[in-house]
Amino acid sequence: MKKTLLGAIATSALFAFSGTASYAAECIAPANPGGGWDFTCRQIGKILYDIGAEDSPVQVTNMPGAGGGLAYNHVVTERADDADLIIAASSATTTRLAQNAYAGMTADQVRFVGAIGADPGVIAVAADSEFQSLNDLVDAILAEPGSVAFAGGSAVGGFDHLKPLMVLKEAGFTDIGSVKYIGVDGGADAITQTVGGFTQAMTGDMSEIVSFLENGDIRVIAVLTEERVPGFDDIPTATEQGFPVVAVNWRGLYVPKDISDDQFNAWAGKLQQVADSPEWAQAMADNGLAPFTKVGGDFQSYVDGLVSDIATMSAELGVTQ
């Protein structure tokens, strides 16, 4: 019943938003205009046309509903072989799929074609914290799990909650349910909790903490990227501290599952062209994103691993739907 309802609503949404002649390519933003998924479609779509990767402007269709589930259902059930369709996605997409939030649908029902920018994940402490490094924090948790509480801007089981747990997994820690986490309303509130001494650390995204970092309120003890973030070169990655974790709010696309490998690779190549363009570099600078380029099979492998890890942790936390 739930899937049938989603399908009916998705079909209605498509007709509501598709009253114009179709173009060669369409990008579905699974949200209302103005959000992150809408930004992904409009920026990538515009640049694809501007650099000549697409012969015609990319049509953007907004299809909000069910946290991205409405659009996902539409693609899987109605357009599984549409090679002219791309769909905006982010780390929220993979988290919801891993937690079975899309009415029983799974991540292997589409193909993840690429990500070309991200808001880096961070772990931060108050400026006067006793923890000088990520290793100090991890050692404290290993010695006494209840001694450290994290604050984050997502609910229990959300991506902010999962970031430090990924690090602890790499340290061999398995009792993740014993780690204290307080979900608050956004990164600023999480920082307030930490600076005020109510929690010992906060977990969030780089864009949320920049002003607090510049004011000297906090110290970032790890950025969860493969390499240090340009402009914040003094902040070490978790990887270089011995915990190979990449946890970023990536901006990317998926495509229908049943398109051919050649069609999949063509979209991957076009995304790489966008990633390499000065237009995209400017778009990232204007919107607080850091470079994060994975396309084609490399990105699909990254997503597969991410979904598997999140599914395991979510089951242990009891948040799988």
Where are these regions (language model features)?
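N-terminal (or domain-start) structured segment
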Residues: 23-108, 173-201, 293-294, 316-321
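C-terminal segment of classical bacterial N-terminal signal peptides
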Residues: 14-22
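A ligand-binding cleft/hinge motif common to bilobed small-molecule-binding domains
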Residues: 91-101, 165-172, 200-233, 311
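Hinge/capping helix and adjacent helix->loop/strand transition within the periplasmic-binding protein
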Residues: 50-52, 74-85, 97-189, 251-283
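An extracytoplasmic/periplasmic, membrane-proximal ligand-sensing/linker region
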Residues: 261-321
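Periplasmic-binding protein-like
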Residues: 115-122, 222-257
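Bacterial N-terminal signal peptides that target proteins for export
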Residues: 1-9
